[in-house]
From Swiss-Prot:
Its EC number is 2.7.7.77. Its main location: cytoplasm. CDD domains: MobA (cd02503). It is an enzyme of class 2 (transferase). It comes from the Bacteria. The keyword Metal-binding applies. Keywords: Cytoplasm, GTP-binding, Magnesium, Metal-binding, Molybdenum cofactor biosynthesis, Nucleotide-binding, Transferase. One of its GO terms (biological process) is bis(molybdopterin guanine dinucleotide)molybdenum biosynthetic process. Transfers a GMP moiety from GTP to Mo-molybdopterin (Mo-MPT) cofactor (Moco or molybdenum cofactor) to form Mo-molybdopterin guanine dinucleotide (Mo-MGD) cofactor. This is Molybdenum cofactor guanylyltransferase. SUPFAM superfamilies: Nucleotide-diphospho-sugar transferases (SSF53448). The gene is mobA.
Length: 191
């Protein structure tokens, strides 16, 4: 296993409708005095010189947290698969860390563990928690872009199903692992 990890791009998905947040843009919702995106940014900024945020609104608010912003090719918030495709298209490195904007407890150890697993297996790596895949915590080789584009063209809209068309390494995490907490509803902001 290599000691040094290769350069990676970071893709933060912030392009959703925020339905469980009453339509509010989740990445910009305050938690502990800062927008959720600021918490994620603080962890990932030292890990990459290529930080991309997929957002479909509020670009001016996200700009300070990214090197580049991308939007979905289709209107009406088509889902995380569209955001991943858009992000992979502009990523500068061969490995891309994919994270949600509403996961402020993610840490460097988890990200580096996923990256190491992906590089060692020369394939995508995704968190598995309690037997379930968690595609919002993954590392993808940029070369999976055509597979995801083909899945999209065939009508697939599930990021997880599209990713599982290829070999994926699973990083097992406990069900109680707080690093995987998604703050995707108002009651979660009280945690």
């Amino acid at each position: 296993m290599p000691d040094a990890l290769p350069p990676c791009s970071i893709l933060i998905l912030a392009g959703g409708r925020g339905q469980r947040m009453g339509g509010r843009d989740k990445g910009l919702v305050d938690w502990q005095g800062e927008p959720l995106i600021a918490h994620v940014h603080r962890v990932v900024r030292p890990l990459s010189d290529d930080l991309v945020i997929s957002c479909n609104r509020n670009q001016a608010a996200y700009r300070p947290y990214a090197d580049r912003l991308v939007g979905d090719a289709e209107a009406d918030f088509p889902g995380p698969l569209a955001g991943v495709i858009a992000g992979l298209r502009v990523a500068r490195h061969g490995w891309v860390v994919v994270l949600a904007c509403d996961a402020p407890l993610v840490d460097r150890e988890l990200i580096e563990g996923l990256l190491r697993l992906a590089v060692t297996g020369n394939s995508a790596a995704m968190v598995r928690q309690g037997g379930f895949w968690q595609p919002m915590f993954s590392v993808l080789p940029k070369r999976v872009l055509p597979v995801l584009e083909q899945a999209w063209a065939a009508g697939e809209r599930s990021l997880q199903k599209a990713l599982l068309r290829e070999a994926v390494q699973g990083l097992e995490c406990a069900e109680s692992d707080r690093r995987l907490s998604n703050f995707n509803s108002p009651d979660r902001l009280q945690d």
